[in-house]
A protein has these predicted regions:
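Well-ordered alpha-helical scaffold segments within catalytic/enzyme domains
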Residues: 1-3, 41-55, 94-111, 156-174, ...
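Residues within HEAT/ARM-like alpha-solenoid scaffolds
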Residues: 90, 110-117, 153-156, 174-181, ...
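N-terminal beta1-alpha1-beta2 module of alpha/beta enzyme domains
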Residues: 20, 29, 33-41, 45, ...
Length: 335
């Protein structure tokens, strides 16, 4: 596909996302679906990349209004109310990445100042679950009791969110040495003590995100990152189709394929990144959205009739990462 064609495609995908935004500013997965803070931020980043500043600003205003006093958000919201009463550490810190990307694109310093208390609260909630080993517990339940497990994927994302939080603080003339220190503790734990992660009993290591997220967030880079990706390529990739969500499922997903594409773009493998994007183009629907995934080799859309806003956001982010340049290239996690 040409750059112009990709531009038209992501503009239609942005229309799809914006068309699902509620008057409150929340961006649910689909009509009458739930809104979770992490995917909501991913959609806001995608809207920013397409110049939809009004919609993205409303998305962040929703986050500001729904943030809990302790800096967290509930896991899901629906019809304006909390749906699942858990507080995810990754959800709370990820707002920093979204706010920083909005600033990089819009250059709106007033927005950065207005969102600072939200960012500060979210990150401080997350760091309240960091352990001396560097790991950050997954979440707290409705009783405020921590879930004593640290998924590698969410920990990698928290690492990047902390770096973005430090950048926000610096842009505002503030110091945040404890955030920088916390990010380095996470990095050391991931690089030196991987056995500390994914200890809850679930086979989280069988998920593609655990494979590529340390590369996507810059925890593994250079030739080591390329070797890391090659090491499990044959396990997760179905040639011509995309990336499996998990090893035990016979389907590939657009979101995972796009995140892997971003990871490849980050380490300079842009041609391979574009190839992955080409593979998911058949899942682009007439309304601008993308089907969540497809069963292989049958080629049957799966789950049936599901087109999520965050899937379209993933396509936008990956497209910019693979064909963009300058600061906006890899803007999902880099800036």
């Amino acid at each position: 596909m040409t750059v112009q064609t990709f531009g038209e495609l992501i503009d239609r995908a942005a229309d799809f996302i914006a068309g699902h935004q509620l008057p409150s500013g929340a961006i649910p997965w689909y009509r009458d679906g739930v809104t979770d803070p992490w995917d909501h931020v991913a959609c806001a980043i995608a809207l920013d990349l397409c110049g939809r500043f009004e919609e993205s600003t409303r998305a962040y205003e929703w986050l500001s209004k729904t943030q809990n006093p302790d800096g967290s958000w509930w896991y899901y919201y629906q019809d304006g109310l909390p749906k699942e009463m858990a507080k995810d550490s990754n959800h709370s810190s990820y707002v920093a990445t979204g706010v920083w990307q909005h600033y990089l694109i819009s250059k709106d310093m007033d927005f950065l100042r207005q969102m600072w208390p939200v960012v500060e609260g979210g990150i401080n909630f997350t760091l309240g679950m960091q352990q001396p080993s560097g790991v950050v517990w997954w979440a707290r339940d409705y009783k405020d009791e921590a879930w004593p497990s640290a998924p590698l994927t969410t920990s990698s994302c928290i690492y990047q969110s902390l770096l973005d939080g430090v950048k926000i603080a610096k842009a505002l003339g503030l110091d945040s040495p404890e955030w920088d220190e916390a990010s380095q503790k996470i990095a050391r734990a991931i690089r030196e003590k991987p056995e500390l992660f994914d200890t809850a009993g679930d086979n989280l290591r069988g998920y593609a995100m655990n494979w590529y997220y340390p590369v996507l967030t810059g925890l593994i880079d250079g030739e080591r990152a390329r070797e890391h990706i090659r090491g499990e390529w044959g396990e997760f990739i179905v040639e011509g189709w995309g990336c499996k969500c998990s090893l035990d499922q016979p389907w590939v997903t657009v979101a995972e394929t796009c995140e892997l594409s971003m990871a490849l773009a980050r380490i300079g493998e842009t041609q391979q990144a574009k190839t992955l994007l080409d593979w998911v183009m058949p899942l682009h629907d007439a309304d601008g959205g993308f089907w969540t995934g497809v069963r292989v080799p049958e080629g049957i859309v799966y789950p049936p009739d599901e087109k999520t806003t965050w899937t379209s956001a993933g396509v936008i982010l990956a497209t910019v990462a693979s064909i963009g340049d300058g600061e906006l290239s890899n803007t999902h996690l880099k800036g």
